[in-house]
Amino acid sequence: MKPVFLDFEQPIAELTNKIDELRFVQDESAVDISDEIHRLQKKSNDLTKSIFSKLTPAQVSQVSRHPQRPYTLDYIEALFTDFEELHGDRHFADDYAIVGGLARFNGQSVMVVGHQKGRDTKEKIRRNFGMPRPEGYRKALRLMKTAEKFGLPVMTFIDTPGAYPGIGAEERGQSEAIGKNLYELTRLHVPVLCTVIGEGGSGGALAVAVGDYVNMLQYSTYSVISPEGCASILWKTAEKAADAAQALGITADRLQKLDLVDTVIKEPLGGAHRDFGQTMKNVKAVLEKQLHEAQSIPLADLLSRRFDRIMAYGKFSEQ
């Protein structure tokens, strides 16, 4: 797959194109230009490190939405075995913006639930661009309650712009579905591990992100509203999105300082989409450690900690 570069990555894109051209020349001729290729590769890596070491919150938001970033089904394929997808909420319909089912993690049976976006236009429409309707959240809850019944740990992957704001979704109880999930997750009698892998958009993300451990990938975001939405409300123009992103504090490192996130999972150079394999290794290492820890904590303590975590959301201090 040809890499897609964001606007602030254009200097990297130019070097990458030049490297590709030199490789083509070397393949088509007897001229050895490997030293020049290696020099440009090092220059590209150094430039990428420099750019990504000083990303603004608005740029991190762009990376979190990158079209080639790994989605929930990519993590399921890489980290789990024997995945059996489960469908439907048993009330209205099957929402393809939420995927989930039974799987094995290192041989242990677990329940996996997550948001799913699409790669191409057809799939994006089918998945509703990763924005669940009420039936999606009710499906997620049905799966998590099934996990509780059989004593299976729950692992969730969060990647959504937010809950779908359509009229039909509101008529079918969007806010009730999200609120019910928050309530039930605080009292679910099994370990719950949550990982933000892309966008963590408001209540649409929180509905599957109440857990014993909450992780974020290095270039993922988590906020009550998108920077563009915030700017449109406060300044009446989306052009102020960069200012909104700065004020919202949407980045993983900022949220970890506020004790809203347990672990920030390091991404490969250039973001998770540049090296799926390394990304999966990093995520797996964290989940292995946390699952072992969660299963060693008495259930009463686990539930108390989980409840205290969500009740701490929204607290603030004036400086």
Curated annotation (Swiss-Prot):
SUPFAM superfamilies: ClpP/crotonase. Its main location: cytoplasm. GO terms for molecular function: acetyl-CoA carboxylase activity; ATP binding; carboxyl- or carbamoyltransferase activity. The keyword Nucleotide-binding applies. It catalyses: N(6)-carboxybiotinyl-L-lysyl-[protein] + acetyl-CoA = N(6)-biotinyl-L-lysyl-[protein] + malonyl-CoA. The keyword Cytoplasm applies. InterPro entries: Acetyl_CoA_COase_a_su (IPR001095), ClpP/crotonase-like_dom_sf (IPR029045), COA_CT_C (IPR011763). Pathway: Lipid metabolism; malonyl-CoA biosynthesis; malonyl-CoA from acetyl-CoA: step 1/1. Its EC number is 2.1.3.15. Keywords: ATP-binding, Cytoplasm, Fatty acid biosynthesis, Fatty acid metabolism, Lipid biosynthesis, Lipid metabolism, Nucleotide-binding, Transferase. GO terms for biological process: fatty acid biosynthetic process; malonyl-CoA biosynthetic process. Residues 39-293 form the CoA carboxyltransferase C-terminal domain. It is found in: Cytoplasm. GO terms for cellular component: acetyl-CoA carboxylase complex. Acetyl-CoA carboxylase is a heterohexamer composed of biotin carboxyl carrier protein (AccB), biotin carboxylase (AccC) and two subunits each of ACCase subunit alpha (AccA) and ACCase subunit beta (AccD). PANTHER family: ACETYL-COENZYME A CARBOXYLASE CARBOXYL TRANSFERASE SUBUNIT ALPHA, ACETYL-COENZYME A CARBOXYLASE CARBOXYL TRANSFERASE SUBUNIT ALPHA, CHLOROPLASTIC. Belongs to the AccA family. Component of the acetyl coenzyme A carboxylase (ACC) complex. First, biotin carboxylase catalyzes the carboxylation of biotin on its carrier protein (BCCP) and then the CO(2) group is transferred by the carboxyltransferase to acetyl-CoA to form malonyl-CoA. This is Acetyl-coenzyme A carboxylase carboxyl transferase subunit alpha. It comes from Neisseria meningitidis serogroup C (strain 053442). The gene is accA.
